[in-house]
């Protein structure tokens, strides 16, 4: 399916009318989680903010390890949005994608989003004492 068809089908399955704006964007709220969709050519970017990065230097190593080959990120990528100074999760879909594959990857994305938002909501780890 083409990007516009994927988005429309997602909306139909959620029971809402959903389409990309003239700017090629839309946002869907899954519970408490905002997920942004942005089209650029034949690529659909799926993005969500995880948490502010300020004061979370303790999280960088863990997030990098989780990001390695998508092992703990549902196949998505964890990064730092420098403009917002926040950790973000993002994935892409390219070209024609069967809807069931898109939905399965989106489900993994949302599960990863919720896991990392919860993990990042925990208090920052205390630095280890160096002797």
Please state what every model-predicted region is.
Residues 120-131:
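Short, highly charged C-terminal tails/helix-capping segments
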Residues 36-49:
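Short, well-structured hydrophobic secondary-structure segments
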Residues 87-91:
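Short, aliphatic-rich beta-strand segments
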Residues 105, 110-113:
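Helix-rich interaction surfaces within compact, conserved domain-sized segments
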Residues 1-34, 71-75, 79-81:
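Charge-rich, low-complexity N-terminal segments
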Residues 47-83:
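Short, internal acidic amphipathic alpha-helical interface segments
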Residues 35-36, 97:
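Short, charged/polar, Gly/Pro-enriched secondary-structure boundary elements
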Residues 95-104:
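A short acidic/glycine-rich loop-to-helix N-cap element
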């Amino acid at each position: 399916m083409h990007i516009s068809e994927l988005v429309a089908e997602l909306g139909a399955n959620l029971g809402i009318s959903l389409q990309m704006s003239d700017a090629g964007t839309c946002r869907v709220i899954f519970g408490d989680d905002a997920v942004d969709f942005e089209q650029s050519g034949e690529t659909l970017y799926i993005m969500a903010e995880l948490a502010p990065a300020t004061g979370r230097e303790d999280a960088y190593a863990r997030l990098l390890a989780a990001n390695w080959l998508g092992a703990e990120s549902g196949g998505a990528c964890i990064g730092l949005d420098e403009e917002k100074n926040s950790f973000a999760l993002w994935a892409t879909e390219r070209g024609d994608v069967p809807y069931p594959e898109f939905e399965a990857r989106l489900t993994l994305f949302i599960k990863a989003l919720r896991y990392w938002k919860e993990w990042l909501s925990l208090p920052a780890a205390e630095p280890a004492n160096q002797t």
